[in-house]
Design a protein with these regions (language model features):
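C-terminal non-catalytic interaction/assembly regions of soluble proteins
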Residues: 1-141
C-alpha cells in the first residue's frame, strides 16, 4: 500500500453572519403593484447596508425570477425580503422594517412575519496529521 498522507481534510464550521427575513401579504386590486412598492420602499431604506439583499414576490417571481411572470397579474402576492449581514442587529432590522409596512407602507398589507437565523459556514482545510487527536465521548440522555 501507500504511506499515510501527511495531511487530512477537515471540515470546519464557523459563524458566517446572520440572515434577517420579513414577509407581508397583499391581496385584492393592484396587489402586485402594492407589493412591489413595498419592496422598493424597504430596498431604498436599508438595502445598501447589507452584503446580500433579496426581494421576492411569492406567487409571482420567487422561483424563476421576473422573466417568466412579466405582464401577469395576481389577486394575491406575498412579499419576502431577506438580507445577510455579519451584524445580528442589522439583520434583525429587516423584519422590523417589513413589519413597519403595516402602518408606513402601501395599504392592505397583512400577515407580516419576521425571522432571524444564524448562518454557520463550512470550509474544508488540510491539517497536519499530528495535530489531530481522535476523541470519542458518549452522552446519555
Amino acid at each position: 500500500g501507500k504511506p499515510k498522507p501527511e495531511t487530512l481534510k477537515v471540515s470546519v464550521g464557523y459563524q458566517a453572519g446572520w440572515i434577517g427575513e420579513g414577509e407581508i401579504s397583499y391581496a385584492g386590486a393592484h396587489a402586485v403593484e402594492r407589493a412591489k412598492l413595498a419592496g422598493e420602499i424597504i430596498h431604498k431604506r436599508i438595502g445598501d447596508h447589507f452584503d446580500e439583499f433579496r426581494v421576492d414576490y411569492i406567487g409571482l417571481s420567487s422561483l424563476h425570477g421576473e422573466s417568466l411572470s412579466q405582464g401577469s397579474s395576481s389577486y394575491e402576492v406575498r412579499l419576502r425580503i431577506a438580507a445577510k449581514s455579519k451584524n445580528q442587529a442589522l439583520a434583525q432590522l429587516v423584519g422590523e422594517e417589513v413589519e413597519a409596512l403595516y402602518t408606513n407602507g402601501p395599504a392592505g398589507g397583512s400577515g407580516a412575519r419576521k425571522y432571524l437565523s444564524e448562518v454557520i459556514g463550512v470550509v474544508s482545510i488540510l491539517m497536519n496529521r499530528d495535530q489531530i487527536h481522535p476523541h470519542i465521548q458518549v452522552f446519555k440522555s
